[in-house]
Amino acid sequence: MNPNQKIITIGSISLGLVVFNVLLHVVSIIVTVLVLGRGGNNGICNETVVREYNETVRIEKITQWHNTSVVEYVPYWNEGTFMNNSEAICDVKGFAPFSKDNGIRIGSRGHVFVIREPFVSCSPTECRTFFLTQGSLLNDRHSNGTVKDRSPFRTLMSVEVGQSPNVYQARFEAVAWSATACHDGKKWMTIGVTGPDSKAVAVVHYGGVPTDVVNSWAGDILRTQESSCTCIQGNCYWVMTDGPANRQAQYRIYKANQGKIVGQTDVSFNGGHIEECSCYPNDGKVECVCRDNWTGTNRPVLVISPDLSYRVGYLCAGLPSDTPRGEDAQFTGSCTSPMGNQGYGVKGFGFRQGTDVWMGRTISRTSRSGFEILRVKNGWTQTSKEQVRKQVVVDNLNWSGYSGSFTLPVELSGKDCLVPCFWVEMIRGKPEEKTIWTSSSSIVMCGVDYEVADWSWHDGAILPFDIDKM
């Protein structure tokens, strides 16, 4: 075959392949059109149908592709609307894990803040973990001495729930060594307490900017909840303490609307002590279970009405839930008086379920280790000892710490009741371990309609860190 014949042959083959390729594309287009025609889509490949609902909480987005429909639920919230939060608490049978940040494990090699007092609060579209930093990172020399509660370096910051308190995702909220935060449906409100012990100031932030202040009125370490405040129909409520930690102090309830204080009430509680209240909305009121750092091993209860009237007493249950505490068998409960005659204490929580109560406590009676939650029949209204459910969250071989409450709003959960949730802080480092620092991580649990098995969701960091060996 001469060169000209070779060129003609190669050209003919190439032309044939091109024609064949064009025919394949034509067939593919015809088949696609026929398939779409059978699907009844009138030839539209992608169609988005938006359906409006009476509740402005979701958009139903239907994407049709060939003969398959994919339904996505897109969260939507009108930011010009206050949350209701006047619903009742859901009745639950157990608590399932919601999130765990593993901050200390990650912080051995990551840029994670040294923190204490983490807590969770939710808006209509998200939950966030708030925490008080020490202005330093784990495994860094500035972490030395961070066992101290109050310093000018402490700040309130937040991340999306489940994230570690890392420098890349954290959002600054306030300068604070004591704090609370909550969302009214429109914006976040945070309260950060800072300054000298005798003249501390609480700065109210709304939407990220300062809007009001509370100055210390007793001159003795003004402090607040270290957990979520509570917003109901646009008004937000929180509790503050000023005065001694080991004898009679002074207590106040505050009410704010869009970051401006619109009311306050002194709580008369002679012989009782209130600190670090864990509050939540229930049936249009604010229910708080607090810490008695003076004498009681039972917990103070404060129920706040929208007009700032209140009822104050103690959790009636015949089982103690503070730490340190005595034996369960030797404890007799009281709805009105401190019982147990044990000083000191730890922040804790409880949830009313009708006349029952879910109450959290450390497993150890003498130290902040282990954590369990008990349901006590009629424990909200009577000195009952009858446990109808118990769930272990952290075993007694591992450290725990503070614990507190919050709820999932109906706008977020899609339920017609408020889902009760709690968090448990797991403190590591000083004073119990040989480190130069003190920090914590947390596990978060939310109520479900099923019983949940015992397990230990403990911190799990291996100590000491490199900085502790220098």
Curated annotation (Swiss-Prot):
Subunit structure: Homotetramer.
Annotated family: Belongs to the glycosyl hydrolase 34 family.
Hypervariable stalk region: annotated segments: 32-86
Binding residue positions for Ca(2+): 292, 296, 322
InterPro entries attached to this UniProt entry: Glyco_hydro_34, Sialidase_sf
Annotated organism of origin: Influenza A virus (strain A/Duck/Burjatia/652/1988 H3N8)
Protein name: Neuraminidase
Topological domains, Virion surface: 36-470
